[in-house]
């Protein structure tokens, strides 16, 4: 085992604090509408320019092992805030730095770190309940757009686009962000249920110009296994021909005699038909077929359930108003499923999301939920250069996460004002002087975000704080974008409660760990052995050779 280097007490805390300051100072320049960019060198390609706190934090590694420990613990604050609320990473970093610096001063003055930690926890709990008490629910499209605009650093176009996407696919719908190949940023909405399987044979195409299959008022056969033989299919095909409606077959695969017969009948015009492979694999395929059955009001034909294909009646087929299939995707619009059954299926998937511990499973379940509940919207972010597109995509991601958080837990006035107001409402009492000092640490730290926003805008932070506190209205604050004071909610400067809350809770959690640190252990640097690099001995007899 390699030797370790151990430092204690004040030295351990000081070196960690240096790391905390290095990371926080790099991250906090990005805070607020007048925040600056940070340029990050990449091992290949152009440097990356960003205003996203967590992206900056993830790039920082320091040479000194103990400074690096402090920086990595602070990086955890930004990552945690990003995971919980998807935004507020810079605010969390600024708060953590403020709590750590104040806390370290008190510990150096001889106060008990554990009592300070208890005081910090009490104050944070009080602030969280104060934020929840004063939050306002987001209802209108305008409010959703305002939240998105603020988080995208004042880009109205992005805020509007997110509001439009949420209006179209609902709060449960999936909204994804991709890089576009064009200059413009655009919104693409897919209604209904879409899955990533295209037509099995191009002979099914009904619209040769667009190379797609379009079917109206469709019957849908959902089969779990592979269809190769024609015989079991004949009874249901005859019934479908008599009904004069198109048929879509979704099965594990369709090949051989079955596929040949379907294609021939389609080309002769006797049968409007198309076949696609079922989405997913293994157990997930079964679950997705069941989703399709609920959505279309049909039944999955499965040998496990004892249902044979030759015994299938028309009542077991699903229905949909419209189906569109291209070579990669199938979209089913307006399925004939009962609303009650769809809602039951949605709540079942929601419960599975709550119960699962795997991020991958959660993501897949959320996709299924969105396909059942709303639809899918894609925001394609454009720009003149690759660097610009990446920077804008970061901001759109932040804005999208902030908007979702706002819909979930409501909003408070932005610009750091909510935390500043809450700092004056902390009325918990510490059990002793050290706990009281812990509460005071949080009171002072809650001023840090608004001071930083003001300073990034080139205004004196102390003046801004005093001006705001002299006004009694909770929503009165400083708009750094326009450098005006006024009602921030009316100006559209708002923050989601979830973002502010998780920023504070994560900052306090990691800051408390740093304050209560009494020793640090790191791997000792390896000493270079003297005399290295020489030729090994024992080759003396080769001196006369001429190379």
Swiss-Prot record:
Composition bias type Gly residues, residue spans: 530-547
Alphabetical GO CC annotations of the entry are:
cytoplasm
- EC id: 5.6.1.7
- Gene3D superfamilies, A to Z: GroEL, GroEL-like equatorial domain, TCP-1-like chaperonin intermediate domain
The record lists ATP as bound by: 30-33, 51, 87-91, 415, 495
Enumerate the residue ranges of region (Disordered). Answer: 526-547
Function field: Together with its co-chaperonin GroES, plays an essential role in assisting protein folding. The GroEL-GroES system forms a nano-cage that allows encapsulation of the non-native substrate proteins and provides a physical environment optimized to promote and accelerate protein folding.
Give the protein family.
Belongs to the chaperonin (HSP60) family.
Q: What is this protein called?
A: Chaperonin GroEL
Which species is this record about?
Answer: Hyphomonas neptunium (strain ATCC 15444)
This chain is encoded by the gene named groEL
């Amino acid at each position: 085992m390699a030797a370790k280097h151990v430092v204690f007490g004040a030295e351990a805390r000081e070196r960690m604090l240096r790391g905390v300051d290095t990371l926080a100072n790099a991250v906090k320049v990005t805070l607020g509408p007048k925040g600056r960019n940070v340029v990050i060198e990449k091992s290949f390609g152009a440097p990356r320019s960003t205003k996203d706190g967590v992206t900056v934090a993830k790039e920082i590694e320091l040479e000194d092992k103990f400074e690096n420990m402090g920086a990595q613990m602070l990086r955890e604050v930004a990552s945690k805030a990003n995971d919980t609320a998807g935004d507020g990473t810079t605010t969390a970093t600024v708060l953590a730095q403020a709590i750590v610096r104040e806390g370290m001063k008190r510990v150096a003055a001889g106060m008990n770190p554990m009592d300070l930690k208890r005081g910090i926890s009490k104050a944070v709990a009080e602030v969280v309940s104060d934020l929840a008490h004063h939050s306002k629910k987001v209802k209108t499209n305008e409010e959703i757009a305002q939240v998105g605009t603020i988080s995208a650093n004042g880009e109205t176009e992005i805020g509007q686009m997110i509001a439009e996407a949420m209006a179209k696919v609902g709060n449960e719908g999936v909204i994804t962000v991709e890089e576009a190949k064009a200059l413009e940023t655009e919104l693409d909405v897919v209604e209904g249920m879409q899955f990533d399987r295209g037509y099995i044979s191009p002979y099914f195409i009904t619209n040769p110009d667009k190379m797609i299959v379009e079917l109206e008022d469709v019957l849908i056969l959902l089969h779990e296994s592979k269809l190769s033989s024609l015989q079991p299919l004949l009874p249901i095909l005859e019934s479908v021909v008599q009904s004069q409606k198109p048929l879509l077959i979704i099965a594990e695969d369709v090949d051989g005699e079955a596929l040949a017969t379907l294609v021939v009948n389609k080309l002769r015009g006797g049968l409007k038909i198309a076949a696609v492979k079922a989405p997913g694999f293994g157990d997930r395929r079964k679950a997705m077929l069941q989703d399709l059955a609920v959505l279309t009001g049909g039944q999955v034909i499965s040998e496990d359930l004892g249902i044979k294909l030759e015994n299938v009646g028309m009542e077991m087929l699903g229905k949909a108003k419209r189906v569109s299939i291209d070579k990669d995707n199938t979209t089913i619009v307006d399925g004939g499923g009962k609303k009650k059954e769809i809602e039951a299926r949605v709540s079942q998937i929601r419960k599975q999301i709550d119960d699962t511990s795997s991020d991958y499973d959660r993501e897949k379940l959320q996709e299924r939920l969105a396909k059942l509940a709303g639809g899918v919207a894609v925001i394609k972010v454009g720009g003149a250069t690759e660097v610009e597109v990446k920077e804008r995509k970061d901001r759109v991601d932040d804005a999208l996460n902030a908007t979702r958080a706002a819909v979930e837990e409501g909003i408070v006035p932005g610009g750091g004002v909510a935390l500043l107001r809450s700092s004056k409402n902390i009325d918990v009492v510490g059990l002793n002087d050290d706990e009281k000092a812990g509460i005071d640490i949080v009171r002072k730290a809650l001023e840090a975000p608004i001071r930083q926003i003001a300073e990034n805008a080139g205004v004196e932070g102390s003046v801004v704080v005093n001006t705001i506190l002299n006004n009694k209205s909770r929503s009165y604050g400083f708009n750094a974008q326009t450098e005006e004071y006024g009602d921030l909610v009316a100006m559209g400067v708002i923050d989601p409660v979830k973002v502010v809350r998780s920023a504070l809770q994560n900052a306090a959690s990691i800051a408390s760990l740093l304050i209560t640190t009494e020793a640090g252990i790191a791997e000792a640097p390896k000493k270079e052995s003297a005399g290295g690099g020489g030729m090994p001995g024992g080759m003396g007899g080769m001196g006369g050779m001429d190379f």
